[in-house]
Amino acid sequence: MNITQVKIKKLENFSGSLPEYATEHSAGMDLIAANEQPITIKAGEIQLIPTGIAIALPYSFEAQIRPRSGLAVKHGITVANSPGTIDADYRGEIKVILINLGTQDFVIEKGMRIAQIIISKYERILWEESSILTETMRGSGGFGSTGV
């Protein structure tokens, strides 16, 4: 397994621990809320939650912010723009856009695990305009065409 080092900066509002893998085969690392005061997310509302960290990804890497399944299933709290993308050239604070899809208000406390961050390699592409695309068995079928 290859391991890539990524620089991480603790900002003034940082608290808790740096993101880390929970198990040997975890894909994501938990992000921790770094809000000074509790933030209430009312049912149906969206809030931007600080994490107190900034990162310097190597070029050809991206980070995705994804929901934590426990928050989603127990409280209806998820990442509104899931997955949120952090580009390699972004150097600002990582913030998480949470939405409350539940029926009860939910309070985000400082130090709470609010989302996961997954770091991945990507490739850039160059579009080649064409009037003909190769045929496939699926063709243009989409949006449930292969079953529910």
Swiss-Prot record:
UniProt cofactor(s): Mg(2+)
Domain of life: Bacteria
Alphabetized GO MF terms: dUTP diphosphatase activity; magnesium ion binding
UniProt-listed GO biological process terms: dUMP biosynthetic process; dUTP catabolic process
UniProt entry tagged with the keyword Transcription regulation: no
Keyword tags: Hydrolase, Magnesium, Metal-binding, Nucleotide metabolism
Residue numbers binding substrate: 68-70, 81, 85-87, 95
Keyword Ubl conjugation assigned: no
Pathway: Pyrimidine metabolism; dUMP biosynthesis; dUMP from dCTP (dUTP route): step 2/2
InterPro entries: dUTPase, dUTPase-like, dUTPase-like_sf, dUTPase_trimeric
EC number(s) given by UniProt: 3.6.1.23
Catalysed reactions, semicolon-separated: dUTP + H2O = dUMP + diphosphate + H(+)
HAMAP family: dUTPase_bact (MF_00116)
Family, per entry: Belongs to the dUTPase family.
Chain's role: This enzyme is involved in nucleotide metabolism: it produces dUMP, the immediate precursor of thymidine nucleotides and it decreases the intracellular concentration of dUTP so that uracil cannot be incorporated into DNA.
Protein name, UniProt field: Deoxyuridine 5'-triphosphate nucleotidohydrolase
